A protein has these predicted regions:
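Conserved alpha/beta catalytic core and glycan-binding cleft of carbohydrate-active enzymes
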Residues: 1-107, 159-160, 168, 172-178
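Carbohydrate-interacting/catalytic domains
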Residues: 74-75, 87-94, 98-220
């Protein structure tokens, strides 16, 4: 996933995940503990935001903070990463502070104290939304996965149970992407923006803006 977000093709992410799905029992794949950063890795925001070579010395890494431009990039990609994490098969695991905007390179710079009262409100709200949506939709908890787009910077997959259906769509590139997705219902709702889309022929046509995301559900 990190390779995809940092410039790799979505097809390589799909192929890697499908190889895991095909080689593991379903309970293992759908019950996996999925994480993007831990106490043994640099902070997710730092890795995704960094645009210049990482500082080489320990002293430099200890005090390095992303520039405003890097921070904006990091937050944008962190939202994409977390949307995929929270809607993918398995259980999303969140390293404390990633939801608050903590930065840092390798241990011990990734193990700072939680920034009580100084959290990033935008990221906090985003993660709360993702958690609420995952609790609300059975499909995101236990639904089977099907890929509908995985080429270049565009990725789209669905999760489905007998009574619930969601599609995650992500554009990790700097240009708009147009997708055509299968959709049975006459309407689809992007629960992230509350925008509705009409579908009359079993196909849903939509455009994802640069670094755009959608989480589509059926309209009740």
């Amino acid at each position: 996933l990190m390779a995809y977000l940092l410039g790799g093709g979505a097809e390589y992410f799909r192929d890697s995940m499908e190889q895991l799905r095909e080689n593991y029992p379903a309970p293992a794949f759908y019950g996996a503990m999925n994480f993007l950063s831990t106490h043994d890795t640099p902070r997710l925001l730092t890795i995704l935001g960094l645009t210049s070579p990482a500082p080489q010395t320990r002293d430099e890494r200890a005090v390095y903070r992303l520039t405003d431009k890097e921070l904006a990039r990091g937050k944008t990609l962190l939202k994409l990463a977390s949307l995929i994490l929270y809607t993918f098969p398995g259980t999303p695991m969140l390293y404390y502070g990633d939801e608050a905007g903590m930065q840092g390179f390798e241990d011990p710079f990734n193990r700072g104290t939680y920034p009580w009262g100084h959290e990033d409100p935008e990221l906090l709200a985003w993660f709360r939304t993702l958690g609420a949506l995952r609790r609300e939709h059975d499909a995101l908890q236990c639904g089977a996965i099907t890929y509908h787009a995985a080429q270049g910077r565009a990725l789209a997959f669905s999760r489905r149970t007998n009574g619930d259906h969601c599609i995650t769509a992500v554009n990790a590139g700097s240009e708009p992407v147009t997708l055509t997705l299968p959709w049975d219902a006459p309407l689809a709702l992007d629960v992230l923006s509350q925008q509705e889309f009409f579908c009359g022929d079993g196909l849903l046509r939509l455009t994802l803006e640069p670094y755009g995301t959608m989480l589509l559900t059926e309209v009740e």
